[in-house]
């Protein structure tokens, strides 16, 4: 999985979501804007993170494994049981 570039800095984060409150848009393919990176940070539980392009890659995220979202790359998530997480955006 990619790492955040050293030059990007966090500028906002989402509220904490659970399996019951995750926005439906995150469950379907979507992407960040040009120049916007993000980290999916798990507080509790497991989240399935799928990168849809250029090749499909699925990663199980937990407290030790954070998901890195590259700019303009299609991706989606799926809760695996009970989960709490948030997303931190950087540019």
Over which residues does each language-model region extend?
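Short histidine-centered beta-strand/loop micro-motifs
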Residues: 28-34, 50-51, 58-60, 77-79
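Long, compositionally biased, intrinsically disordered regions
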Residues: 7-11, 66, 86
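Short acidic-glycine-tyrosine-enriched beta hairpin
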Residues: 54-72
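Transition segment at domain starts
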Residues: 1-19
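Short, conserved beta-strand element in jelly-roll/cupin
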Residues: 34-49
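Ligand-binding loop in jelly-roll beta-barrel domains
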Residues: 71-91
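Conserved short histidine dyad/triad with adjacent acidic residue
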Residues: 15-35, 67-71
């Amino acid at each position: 999985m990619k790492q955040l570039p050293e030059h990007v800095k966090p500028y906002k984060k989402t509220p904490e979501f659970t399996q019951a409150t995750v926005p439906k848009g995150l469950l379907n393919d979507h992407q960040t804007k040009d120049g916007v990176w993000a980290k999916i940070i798990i507080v509790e539980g497991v989240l399935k993170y799928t990168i849809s392009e250029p090749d499909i890659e699925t990663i199980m995220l937990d407290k030790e494994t954070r998901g890195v979202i590259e700019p303009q790359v299609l991706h989606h998530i799926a809760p695996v049981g009970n989960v709490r997480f948030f997303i931190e955006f950087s540019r």
